[in-house]
Amino acid sequence: MRLQLRCFIATWSFTMVAVAVAADTVRVVETRSVPPEYFAKAAAATHDLKLSLYAFKNSHWKPDDIVNAVVEALPLISQCGVNVANVELRVLDTPVKYRFFSTPVSRELLREFSVTKPALVFVDDTYSRPAYDAEAIGLSNAQERPELSNTIWFAYGAQDLPHAIAHELVHVLSDNGEHSNAPQNLMQPNTAPSNTRLTDAQCNRLRSVAQSNGLITKR
């Protein structure tokens, strides 16, 4: 699948923009939209999801790698009857400090620049301790950091990225930090290529909570 995805990189529609925000502190320097024909489609979808991705100019992350991984993650979400209707990647030109996740600095970034949620943000590293490859922040664990609600932060080098993206999206869409020990379940504590399944109960919660929180729309 990864080889096929590389073939459509050149077909992305992208627009170069230079939008000054907050006294030129943060600028969008590139926007890429992924054609919808590359999105996984659920046979009986009941809801639509729009995903917003954010990367940084001069970061270690490559836009192609980010979007390839996101597209590979989509079938793991569509099994819950949720189709992805739109995926856009914006590359931000910011001070270097914003390329590293930490609660106070990342809150400052999202006060300076408004993101569309749910938002996936790809940073060079994290200052959190213990350091995780990804940090998902739903409504229930954003009470002391409301700017970060419904965002996911991925550190460069995150392992098994497509499965990590799907795993963290389920956390945010469900507003639930719980894991599962069920065999081959996507929400096992450690992601792996063989862990792809979600139960009916997990999908029901995802749809109900995400719709209530305005993260997906009912068809």
Give each language-model segment a name.
Residues M1-R6:
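Positively charged n-region of N-terminal signal peptides that target proteins for export
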Residues F8-A18:
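Bacterial N-terminal signal peptides
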Residues A23-S128, G214:
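Propeptide-to-catalytic entry region of secreted or membrane-anchored zinc metalloproteases
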Residues D65-E72, L161-I165, L169, Q202:
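Stable alpha-helical elements in mature extracytoplasmic
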Residues L109-S114, T126-L148:
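Catalytic zinc-binding patch centered on the HExxH motif and its immediate surroundings
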Residues P146-A166:
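Short pre-active-site segment immediately N-terminal to the catalytic Zn-binding motif
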Residues L169-Q184:
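Catalytic Zn2+-binding segment of zinc metalloproteases
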